[in-house]
């Protein structure tokens, strides 16, 4: 049997992938990460399925449930918000399943930062402006940043900066990025991306902290900083060049 780590997307239930929806509908056991997972998705679970909210469970308790289901010959749909490859806390579960000899698969989902970019109506890689994206977070008591991965160090690249799990540290984020990006650099914060209660804030590094505080945003938000957010007059991609040799593949 198999444990499926499923990316449930950023918030809107209809952003789930077709593959994920199919697996959920066929799994007799479904574990989901509390309010971070769209509740509508739970309706996809088959009748009689064991549906468990893991928000208050420890890692040991969660893994025990996964191993128990495997021993009973049951597939498990393990739902995480966003995409399992980014700040999902899936690695710890995978490590233990491998030690226990339990088969697993990872099913990708729509990450929060792409949903945030969609809400802003902006591409995060624009020709001549930025062709790189830094996905990061700020240091917390629970998770310290490795040496060299602080915002000041990462900001020296000038790349489009995407900060997860950092709305409550918006003052720190702005302060550490202003030196390399400038006070007038466009900045945006999208909370609850793709959900009905989504909040979109646009400003600059000089103003965004006050905007975030005024809106009462403290969690479930993505901070995006970079010139791409207001880019104009950039060159067209060579993809559209009339001189480019085109093929059918």
Swiss-Prot record:
Catalytic activity entry: precorrin-4 + S-adenosyl-L-methionine = precorrin-5 + S-adenosyl-L-homocysteine
UniProt GO MF annotations: precorrin-4 C11-methyltransferase activity
EC number, as in UniProt: 2.1.1.133
Keyword Methyltransferase recorded: yes
Pfam families, alphabetized: TP_methylase
Pathway: Cofactor biosynthesis; adenosylcobalamin biosynthesis; cob(II)yrinate a,c-diamide from precorrin-2 (aerobic route): step 4/10
InterPro entries cross-referenced by the UniProt entry: 4pyrrol_Mease (IPR000878), 4pyrrol_Methylase_sf (IPR035996), 4pyrrole_Mease_sub1 (IPR014777), 4pyrrole_Mease_sub2 (IPR014776), Cbl_synth_CobM/CibF (IPR006362), Siro_Cobalamin_biosynth (IPR050161), Uropor_MeTrfase_CS (IPR003043)
Family the entry assigns: Belongs to the precorrin methyltransferase family.
Keywords: Cobalamin biosynthesis, Methyltransferase, S-adenosyl-L-methionine, Transferase
Biological process, per Gene Ontology: cobalamin biosynthetic process; methylation
SUPFAM superfamilies: Tetrapyrrole methylase (SSF53790)
Top-level class of the enzyme under EC nomenclature: transferase
Listed name of the protein: Precorrin-4 C(11)-methyltransferase
Domain of life of the source: Bacteria
């Amino acid at each position: 049997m198999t444990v499926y780590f499923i990316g449930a997307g950023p918030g809107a239930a209809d952003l789930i992938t077709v593959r994920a929806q199919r697996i959920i509908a066929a799994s007799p056991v479904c574990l989901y990460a509390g309010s971070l997972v769209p509740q509508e998705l739970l309706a996809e679970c088959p009748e009689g399925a064991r549906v468990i909210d893991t928000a208050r469970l420890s890692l040991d308790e969660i893994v025990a449930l996964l191993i128990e289901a495997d021993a009973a010959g049951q597939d498990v749909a393990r739902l995480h918000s966003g995409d399992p490859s980014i700040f999902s806390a899936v690695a710890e579960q995978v490590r233990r399943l491998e030690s226990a000899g339990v088969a697993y698969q990872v099913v990708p989902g729509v990450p929060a930062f792409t949903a945030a970019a969609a809400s802003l109506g902006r591409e995060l890689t624009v020709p001549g402006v930025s062709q790189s994206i830094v996905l990061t977070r700020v240091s917390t008591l629970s998770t310290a940043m490795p040496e060299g991965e602080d915002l000041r160090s990462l900001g020296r690249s000038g790349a489009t900066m995407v900060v997860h799990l950092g709305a409550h540290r918006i003052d720190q984020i702005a302060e550490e990025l202003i030196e390399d990006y400038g006070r007038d650099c466009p900045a945006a914060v999208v909370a609850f991306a793709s959900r009905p209660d989504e909040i979109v804030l646009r400003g600059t590094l000089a103003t965004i902290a006050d905007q975030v505080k005024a809106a009462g945003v403290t969690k479930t938000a993505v901070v995006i900083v970079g010139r791409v957010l207001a880019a104009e007059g950039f060159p067209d991609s060579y993809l559209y060049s009339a001189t480019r040799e085109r093929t059918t593949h």
